[in-house]
Amino acid sequence: MLYQQIASNKRKTVYVMIGFAILVLFIGAAVGYVFYDSAMAGIIMAAVIAAIYMAMMIANSTNVVMGMNHATEISEADHPEIWHIVEDMALVANIPMPKVYIVNDASPNAFATGNSPKNAAVAVTTGILERLNREELEGVIGHEVSHIRNYDIRLSTIALALSSAIAMLVNIGMRSFWWGGGRRRNDNDNEGGSLEIVMMIISIVLVILGPIATTIAQLALSRNREYLADASSVELTRNPLGLIHALQKISVSEPMKEADPSSAALYISDPFKKKRTMAHLFDTHPPIEDRIQRLERM
């Protein structure tokens, strides 16, 4: 079952890559049509921006994400306990030892990033080291190592890169509008007026709703991966109580100060403790109570 899920995640990586790429091009076309009077110019601009973001994130995702979250790489001598826990969990999961980072934040939390198990990294906050015991830390690290083993981190990296590209496209379009750009037509350019209006409306709606749809899709992927990582952590530690108690402590902690908003979905729990939405569409994580209930049934 687990190996089937890993294979499924690899396929999802391809699907997400294709889907996001298509969405980027459509939004680029809409931005070009509305603000520059040329859908093709928008598509070219979108392709260039997306390619740059993808290259940056895939080639240097660990450094980029760790930098955004103010994380510092450590050695075994700096924090031997957490270092050895990461080492042990990686050994059990049969993956290379990830790099280990520390985020100087009193709120307990952790995340994993990278492009593949060969260049992955795990980050923990100072707060999680102070508040969790060894069994609870093993549950948390087992969860993060599972993200690495299941190739969730690659999916996250691609989604984050292309979401950033979409945000940049919309930003460019809006700045162009405020700086005096925008679509202009001559008074005698009235041929196909009805079609022109329809295309303009569709383009504007796409520019407005495209980033929202992207966010919803990205967060849905994140929520589904959390359940799998929880289950995989128990497979590694053989101790569901460790992760249960860790989640309980994390759920009642204060919001983080050092977390980057665009990386929120990477963390084991929402670092900003935002109020849950009615339909959970904009939640970065599934409810902790639901995760605990699933763990209790194992």
UniProtKB/Swiss-Prot annotation:
GO biological process terms on file: proteolysis
Gene3D superfamilies: Metalloproteases ('zincins'), catalytic domain
TM ranges: 15-35, 39-59, 158-178, 197-217
Location within or outside the cell: Cell membrane
Cofactor: Zn(2+)
Residues annotated as binding Zn(2+): H143, H147, E226
One GO MF term: metalloendopeptidase activity
Keyword Mitochondrion appears in the UniProt entry: no
UniProtKB keywords: Cell membrane, Hydrolase, Membrane, Metal-binding, Metalloprotease, Protease, Transmembrane, Transmembrane helix, Zinc
Domain of life of the organism encoding this protein: Bacteria
GO cellular component: plasma membrane
Residues at the catalytic site: E144
Enzyme class, UniProt record, top EC level: hydrolase
EC number: 3.4.24.-
Membrane topology: Multi-pass membrane protein
Family as reported in the entry's similarity comment: Belongs to the peptidase M48B family.
Protein name per Swiss-Prot or TrEMBL: Protease HtpX homolog
Organism of provenance: Pediococcus pentosaceus (strain ATCC 25745 / CCUG 21536 / LMG 10740 / 183-1w)
